[in-house]
């Protein structure tokens, strides 16, 4: 069966306000630029710009900001047929504080937000069957009714042979407590095909299934999660990232750049890697090099979604490899060898 979509995403859509007078305290900033935000939204835009057919399960406010999101998505050629409008909820707002190249913070307004109002009745099996891959963003598990909608989408995809990617995307301000986070993350992770998360996010996901997870290293987590998934990526900020499969381990460094801000690389990383994973799964070394290159490009950018075209990323990656041929290294590994 020919698939209409390469990816369908489900997750967070927000409005970001980033200061133009940056390297300043937020209380002293007076000029901001508005962007679409939220990890799932940013990844969707990134994937679409990489010439993938992209759909989205979501919910936005029935007002000017909701219209702004839908207009951006349509401009970016993302299908909006399964993004509903809600009159009683507003989109989350994020104000960024860029204090220095190294330090950035955010001020978020996420009470009763629109993106968490997607309901089980909004999840359409026919829509899921039209995609090759379903991408779930972990923030969408934070509250009902979105939580149940995500679980429905997960099991419909799994039971119909659709690959599931879990981008953990932990945001503490959306959750009641850590037990709730770990419980729902574990359910989704154990039913996914691919997991992407930071070391801290993987640790949080593992609290109920591994003893003393705070004392474990990346390899330990990989050995456990590869019992369930085909591939896991563990990110460690400036230390780089690691990709694991049952018989493969790749270690990627970060490409050093002069940063504008200390965030925004993760969504570009996911976009480039997932694009390459779909189109050329046999060459994951190159996919990881592209992903880490895209992340370095984005921390130099003012927004989190303004991904440059593929050719610029390719040139950046090629130059990075010339400077450091060991940007991505293959390590000896077998997850289940005793």
UniProtKB/Swiss-Prot annotation:
Keywords assigned: ATP-binding, Kinase, Nucleotide-binding, Transferase
NCBIfam families xrefs: myo_inos_iolC_N
RNA-binding as UniProt keyword: no
Pfam families: PfkB
Lineage: Bacteria, Bacillati, Mycoplasmatota, Mycoplasmoidales, Metamycoplasmataceae
Gene expressing this chain: iolC
The protein, known as: 5-dehydro-2-deoxygluconokinase
Protein's organism: Mesomycoplasma hyopneumoniae (strain 232) (Mycoplasma hyopneumoniae)
Family per similarity comment: Belongs to the carbohydrate kinase PfkB family.
CDD domains: KdgK
